Amino acid sequence: MKTAVIASLIAGAAAFAPAKNAARTSVATNMAFEDELGAQPPLGFFDPLGLVADGDQEKFDRLRYVEIKHGRISMLAVVGYLVQEAGVRLPGTIDYSGKTFAEIPKFAAFKEIPAGGLVQLLFFIGVLESSVMRDLTGEAEFVGDFRNGAIDFGWDTFDEETQFKKRAIELNQGRAAQMGILAFMVHEQLGVSLLPQ
């Protein structure tokens, strides 16, 4: 865990280091994704590693799918962390030895959960990956659209501009949640709470 803290400190320090001469990407290549969802102020289209410098739309869509998925998971993780920090825990015990859910720490839980519980978690994640968090029907309107013709929640009642804004909001909140859950993890390892006591 100390390694994770040190790595995050190095990454933070690297953000303020002088820029190195990186491989130049042409303006035309960057323009291919300049109007895509997520190219928003203050950064605009941001690809410092040149992952989509070749203008490959399929690669861009795959990376966007991964970003949306991790953003959604991070939003759930932040809410889960805050709920646990507020003292809300499941009642009862997690195993036959009598260990209660309240005794299990937040991020150190993987060391405390019985092997059978971890197998259940991995199975559940596999079910989500294979049958829920993907476009099964081929009817997706955009990358990350997992409605699969089953649920809508009124999405189709919005005009195209409102849908674009809502997708941009989700993407930004997912990005913020990824940074937020990382901050919670680092501060827990440091023994410092980000939340008021």
Curated annotation (Swiss-Prot):
Give the residue spans that cross the bilayer.
73-94, 113-133, 174-196
- UniProt GO BP: photosynthesis, light harvesting
* Annotated Gene Ontology cellular component terms: chloroplast thylakoid membrane; light-harvesting complex; photosystem II
Keywords assigned by UniProt, alphabetized: Chlorophyll, Chloroplast, Chromophore, Light-harvesting polypeptide, Membrane, Photosynthesis, Photosystem II, Plastid, Thylakoid, Transit peptide, Transmembrane, Transmembrane helix
Keyword NADP belongs to the record: no
* Molecular functions per Gene Ontology: chlorophyll binding
Q: What is the protein's membrane topology class?
A: Multi-pass membrane protein
Q: Does the keyword Transport apply?
A: no
Q: Where is the transit peptide?
A: 1-31
The similarity comment for this entry is:
Belongs to the fucoxanthin chlorophyll protein family.
Q: What does this protein do?
A: The light-harvesting complex (LHC) functions as a light receptor, it captures and delivers excitation energy to photosystems with which it is closely associated. Energy is transferred from the carotenoid and chlorophyll C (or B) to chlorophyll A and the photosynthetic reaction centers where it is used to synthesize ATP and reducing power.
Official protein name in the record: Fucoxanthin-chlorophyll a-c binding protein C, chloroplastic
Organism in which the protein naturally occurs: Phaeodactylum tricornutum
